[in-house]
C-alpha cells in the first residue's frame, strides 16, 4: 500500500562549496563558454550544467552555490563538472572540495483535501502561519526535523529546509500523524 511518503519528490537541492581563493569574474566570464555575468543585476557569475541540470552561482570570493539539482548526487556531479572547467582554466581546485547541503525542497501529496482553518487551530498557533488573504497555504514550522511545511487545501505539501533526503520522509510521516490525530485527514 502506498502512502503520502511514497509521493515525495525532490524539487531542488541547494548546496555550497568554495575553492578557497578570490576569482576574477570578468575574466572567468570571458573564458568559460556559456557563463552568464551581469554584475549590475547579480554579483555572481551563473554557469549552468545540462546533465545534470543545475546552476552554479560563482562569487568573487571563490564561494560557489549550486541550485536547481534534483538530488544530492546531481549536486556533486554538477559541481564536479564546474571544478573540472575551473581546473582546465588553470584555476587550482582541491581534489575534493567540501560540499555542504544547505536546503532540500521536496513536494508530496497527502491524498486528501485539507481543512486549513481547522488545521491552523489544531496544529497550534505558535507553529503555524495561515493568512489565506496573503498566501493560500498554511505554513507549519516543525522542530524535528527542522523544516517548514507548506500545506495546501488540495492535500499537496512542500517541505523546505531539509538537510538530508530522509528529512522530507520524516516530516511527512510526522505531519500525517499530527493531522490524523486531529481527525482532519480525509
UniProtKB/Swiss-Prot annotation:
Q: Which Pfam families match?
A: TBP (PF00352)
sequence repeat coordinates: 10-86, 101-179
Name of the featured protein:
TATA-box-binding protein 2
In terms of domain of life, where is this protein from? Archaea
Task: Give the NCBIfam families listed for this entry.
Answer: PRK00394.1-2, PRK00394.1-5, PRK00394.2-2
The reply on keyword Transcription is: yes
Respond yes or no to whether keyword Ubl conjugation is given for this record: yes
Give the organism the record lists. Answer: Haloferax volcanii (strain ATCC 29605 / DSM 3757 / JCM 8879 / NBRC 14742 / NCIMB 2012 / VKM B-1768 / DS2) (Halobacterium volcanii)
Amino acid at each position: 500500500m502506498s502512502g503520502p511518503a511514497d509521493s515525495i519528490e525532490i524539487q531542488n537541492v541547494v548546496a555550497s562549496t568554495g575553492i578557497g581563493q578570490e576569482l576574477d569574474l570578468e575574466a572567468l566570464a570571458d573564458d568559460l563558454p556559456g557563463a552568464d555575468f551581469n554584475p549590475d543585476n547579480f554579483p555572481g557569475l551563473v554557469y549552468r550544467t545540462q546533465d545534470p541540470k543545475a546552476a552554479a552561482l560563482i562569487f568573487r570570493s571563490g564561494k560557489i552555490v549550486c541550485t536547481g539539482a534534483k538530488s544530492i548526487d546531481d549536486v556533486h556531479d554538477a559541481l564536479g563538472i564546474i571544478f573540472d572547467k575551473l581546473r582546465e582554466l588553470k584555476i587550482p581546485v582541491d581534489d575534493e572540495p567540501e560540499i555542504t547541503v544547505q536546503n532540500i525542497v521536496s513536494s508530496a501529496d497527502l491524498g486528501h483535501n485539507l481543512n486549513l482553518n481547522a488545521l491552523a487551530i489544531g496544529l497550534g498557533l505558535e507553529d503555524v502561519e495561515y493568512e489565506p488573504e496573503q498566501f493560500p497555504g498554511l505554513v507549519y514550522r516543525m522542530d524535528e526535523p527542522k523544516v517548514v511545511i507548506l500545506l495546501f487545501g488540495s492535500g499537496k505539501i512542500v517541505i523546505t529546509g531539509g538537510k538530508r533526503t530522509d528529512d522530507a520522509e520524516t516530516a511527512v510521516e510526522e505531519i500525517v500523524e499530527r493531522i490524523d490525530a486531529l481527525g482532519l485527514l480525509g
